[in-house]
């Protein structure tokens, strides 16, 4: 559960409607893979991830980034039940994929950077704080099965 004031919810939702999920998702996942290269071990089937150019031109990175942000957008509709919303993904990432749950936090932080990059002054410190609450809530929900 994420506790946002009504004005924070409205601001988060308004900004999210401007997000280009495919573009931003590919960028966020790409940045995760470049900045934290050990995360690429979870994406061995994606092919060449040996350089930033390879990562950012990789169609599978872009497609999976879109999938991730589409799921994040669904979570924004269910802020009061993130654990329920992400129960299946938590189980998948824990039991089958064995993803270190710390990576969810890293991706959330990278997403905030991507939003700041694209929205500039519109991405105020107050909006950043609201998105940090949301990404923390999502990463906690995704890590729920690990506990």
UniProtKB/Swiss-Prot annotation:
N6-acetyllysine modified-residue sites: 60, 83, 145
Molecular function GO terms recorded: haptoglobin binding; heme binding; hemoglobin alpha binding; metal ion binding; organic acid binding; oxygen binding; oxygen carrier activity; peroxidase activity
Record domain Globin: where: 3-147
Residue positions, PTM S-nitrosocysteine: 94
One record GO biological process: hydrogen peroxide catabolic process
GO cellular component terms, A-Z: blood microparticle; haptoglobin-hemoglobin complex; hemoglobin complex
Residues with PTM N-acetylvaline: 2
Residues bearing PTM Phosphoserine: 45
Keywords of the record: Acetylation, Heme, Iron, Metal-binding, Oxygen transport, Phosphoprotein, S-nitrosylation, Transport
Binding sites annotated in the UniProt record for heme b: 64, 93
Tissue distribution: Red blood cells.
Database matches in Pfam families: Globin
Function: Involved in oxygen transport from the lung to the various peripheral tissues.
Entry's family note: Belongs to the globin family.
Assembly information from the UniProt record: Heterotetramer of two alpha chains and two beta chains.
Protein's name in the database: Hemoglobin subunit beta
Record organism: Bradypus tridactylus
Gene: HBB
